[in-house]
Amino acid sequence: MLALGTSIPVIGEIEAPGLQGALRGTMILPAQSAPMILIIPGSGPTDRDGNNPQGVKAAPYRLLAEGLGEQGIGSVRIDKRGMFGSHAAVEDPNAVTVDDYVQDAGVWIDVIRSRTGAGCVWLLGHSEGGLVALAAAERLENVCGVILVATAGRPLGEVLREQLLANPQIAPLMDAANHAIDELSVGRQVDASKIPPELAPLFGQAVQEFLISTFALDPADLAKNTSKPVLIMQGERDLQVSVADAKRLHEAAPHATPAILPDTNHVLKTVASHDRNENIATYFADNLPLAPGVVDAISRFVKRH
């Protein structure tokens, strides 16, 4: 457990109580009175740094936390329940819903406030984590506001359908994919034995309850109902979430602050061309800085509120 003393800044491991074992993350506290941000990871096995076992090494959350710390803003970046440092929190990391992640966010808020004395905590969600942040802001107390980074403005079932349609290799499987998305979007599970093997990682029985919980939520509706300050940050070179998503969020929540970043992709790295391979290569590079403007936009927004 990270303990605060007189030595500032504080950087180290921090724990929160999970269902069966500890939830774990990394805290950066540049000063005792620093505003605090909880960084909520995106989809799948994404760790507290923003990396995953499939080879993603871009570490956007670690770089973001470090950059914010240099500007006097504290953070806690976390491993999701059942994964990585939080592996003991639950037995099955797939047996989860958005509500479960919201519950965990509430626990983290309590721990952060007790450790730092912060009156409230900002929720920063990246990609799917933005959906969790919006849902949490609607239900939890002591939330300063929401920072949406590369967050879809449509139900995630629609986003997934669009991503699959853009992949020519999936074309022969689109009837099955559309059926699965349609059924899950209305809360019905799909017979896993009838799902083509190529689609099993997406629609397998183990993840269907989670998909049902995410597909049921419209991020734009959640943003519309959020009275707290909202920052909508979107990169123009993002291959997974578009500027149109950011515009839909802003139309639903006109009180939000948009930040559209040129030449910035989904993992917050600089991509100067339309070349897809060049874009994806940044996901696997561990030596690239964040794109210009990412840290500054968040820092300005938090300090203004």
Regions found by a protein language model. Name each.
Residues 264-267, 273-305:
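Catalytic active-site module of serine/aspartate enzymes centered on a nucleophile-bearing elbow/loop
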Residues 226, 232-234:
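Short beta-strand/loop motif that positions the catalytic acidic residue
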Residues 228, 241-252:
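Short alpha-helix in the alpha/beta-hydrolase fold that links the catalytic acid
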Residues 93-114:
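Alpha/beta-hydrolase active-site loop
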Residues 147-220:
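Accessory cap/linker subdomain of secreted extracellular hydrolases
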Residues 4-32, 36:
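N-terminal cap/lid segment of alpha/beta-hydrolase-fold proteins
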